Curated annotation (Swiss-Prot):
Residues 1-80 are annotated as: Disordered. Keywords: Cytoplasm, GTPase activation. Residues 14-31 have a biased composition (Polar residues). It holds the Pfam family RhoGAP. The record marks R222 as: Arginine finger. One of its GO terms (biological process) is small GTPase-mediated signal transduction. The keyword Manganese does not apply. The keyword Cytoplasm applies. This is Rho GTPase-activating protein gacC. Residues 186-375 form the Rho-GAP domain.
């Protein structure tokens, strides 16, 4: 059943279409009226009657050259253009009809005038024929804009009608929603335990290896991938169907990047323990000296339990490597921190605390920018089984 607003909208659409059709029907009748008084009266009567009933046909005008001008014309209620394209096509057709009828009138009207009233009728016929050449194409152009506008106006109604036959929400439940997930919205350690029991690599391992091979792709982590593909890939991950980078299409970089960042966003709890998150915010709010801040961040990072530290290490390491390719991928530490700050530091977004969100982004910015100075402890290779080349630790930044 339609709502009151929908009924009002539909009624407004009907009135707009009928009003436009009546106006243009009357306008076209000016240039197609015959020279005889009787015919003029009949034509005006037809137009008046049809206009009164809002039944002027869009694709026909009252033809004064009919063999029986006194008979009333038959008109049908025009079908409204349903979409912009439909309206535009009708408008183009109307322009063509106007040009043809105008050209026809400049020959036909003088002939009929001369036949009925001699020289005087011929002169009047020429005048009406010329007016038809001007008016009918002009009306066609105006109708083009009218039909197009009607199409735009009626598009929401077309969508509403289509929605009536669409499947209800309960009918669109995907299979993945009925199967217990392995990774998404599952506690971090539990997902690792489940993956190990099933003998499959963790989603993070596959995503990190996949993205690491494509670090120079422009807009990585910023450009959204295909929603359809993201849902499909996520479902396959949660069913244990993706076990290596070979199971992923090389062109799915934006989709896989989206899945990687979404994984951290939808963890029930951040990969960083609450105690360390609190310390991170304290450092950001109280320490302004760059060297002191880096040293304080390093101390907090290295106090994170080994399991969470390894996951955080792998994540920040990947982001750091991507930032080193920012000339190609346009993803600087600042851009990356905006993407990952809220997921890793969990600021109170619902309350709209802008300063807390900014602080979260700044903390992640520092973790990415000074990764090698802050993450001095090696990760546990048995957790994600990702091998890293040994890189020298750079000295702490100096003021």
């Amino acid at each position: 059943m339609e709502s009151k607003d929908q009924n009002v909208y539909r009624k407004g659409s009907d009135n707009f279409s009928k009003g436009s059709n009546t106006f243009f029907g009357n306008l076209k009748s000016i240039s197609t009226t015959t020279t005889t008084t009787t015919t003029t009266a009949n034509t005006d009567q037809q137009v008046s009657k049809v206009a009164e009933n809002n039944e002027i046909d869009d694709n026909s005008s009252v033809d004064s050259s009919s063999s029986n001008p006194s008979s009333s014309s038959t008109s049908t209620t025009p079908v409204k253009p349903k979409t912009f394209v439909d309206g535009a096509l009708r408008g183009v057709w109307s322009i063509g009809v106007g040009v043809v009828n105008g050209a026809k009138g400049i020959v036909e009207q003088p002939y009929l005038g001369a036949k009925n009233n001699g020289l005087g009728g011929f002169v009047k016929g020429v005048a009406k024929g010329v007016s038809g050449v001007v008016i009918l194409p002009a009306v066609g152009v105006l109708e083009f804009f009218s039909y197009t506008t009607q199409g735009i106006y009626n598009t929401p109604i077309t969508v509403l009608d289509a929605m009536k036959s669409s499947p209800k929400e309960e009918e669109m439940i995907t299979v993945s929603a009925e199967i217990p997930t392995i990774f998404f919205a599952v506690e971090l350690e539990e997902s690792f335990k489940t993956a190990k029991e099933k003998g499959i690599p963790h989603l993070l391992k596959v995503c990190i290896e996949f993205i690491s091979r494509r670090k120079n792709i422009e807009g990585i982590f910023r450009i959204s991938g295909s929603k359809f593909l993201i849902d499909e890939i996520q479902s396959k991950f949660d069913k244990g169907l993706i076990t290596s980078v070979e199971d992923l299409d090389p062109n799915w970089i934006y989709e896989v990047a989206c899945i990687f960042k979404s994984y951290f966003r939808y963890l029930p709890h951040s990969v960083i323990p609450d105690e360390q998150i609190t310390e991170f915010y304290r450092i950001q709010n109280n320490i302004t000296d760059a060297t002191e801040k880096a040293a304080a961040l390093k101390a907090v990072v290295n106090s994170i339990p080994n399991f969470q530290y390894t996951i955080l290490y792998e994540c920040i390491s990947l982001l750091h490597d991507i930032s080193l390719n920012s000339k190609e991928n346009l993803m600087t530490p600042s851009n990356l921190s905006i993407v990952y700050g809220p997921s890793l530091l969990r600021p109170n977004i619902e309350k709209g605390d802008i300063q807390e969100i900014a602080n979260a982004n700044t903390i992640v910015f520092n973790l990415i920018s000074f990764f090698q100075q802050i993450f001095i402890k090696n990760p546990d290779p048995s957790i994600l089984e990702i091998e890293h080349p040994i890189t020298p630790i750079k000295p702490m930044i100096q003021k």
